Amino acid sequence: MSYSGRYITKKPKKYRGDPRRIIYRSLWERKFMVYCDTNESVIEWGSEEVIIPYLSPWDGRIHRYFPDFYIKIKQHDGSIKKFIIEVKPKKQCSPPPTQPKRKTKKWFNEVKTWGVNEAKWKYATEWCNKNDMEFKILTEDHLNIRYK
């Protein structure tokens, strides 16, 4: 089940963008926002504040990708590192089967979603390399989310 809402930051000076307009589109994103807001290693963060153009394999057109997060972290050795973060369920981080038993509408949607996500992530990785950043995909494993 997907939850969305407005996040109210406790440290608006850390937020890159308008701190009055922070929206989460899932509880996983909200959990990561709390981490960014409260963790002292996170110097700066933003939610959907970066735009990366990408070529969609589905329609062959240029689209705009808004990654979930931008974060700037002070590492243990004192160096500063910047990341672009995408929060996704683990099941959406691998391709659907190429030869399913039945090619259902759900399967076609999964194939389309996978193709578009793969293109977004490829362009995000290239964009990050050019901008001295690193692209990461966080799943429920990284966010320490357990299912009952």
Task: List the predicted regions and their residue ranges.
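Electrostatic, structured charged patches in enzyme active sites and in nucleic-acid/phosphate-binding
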Residues: 1-148
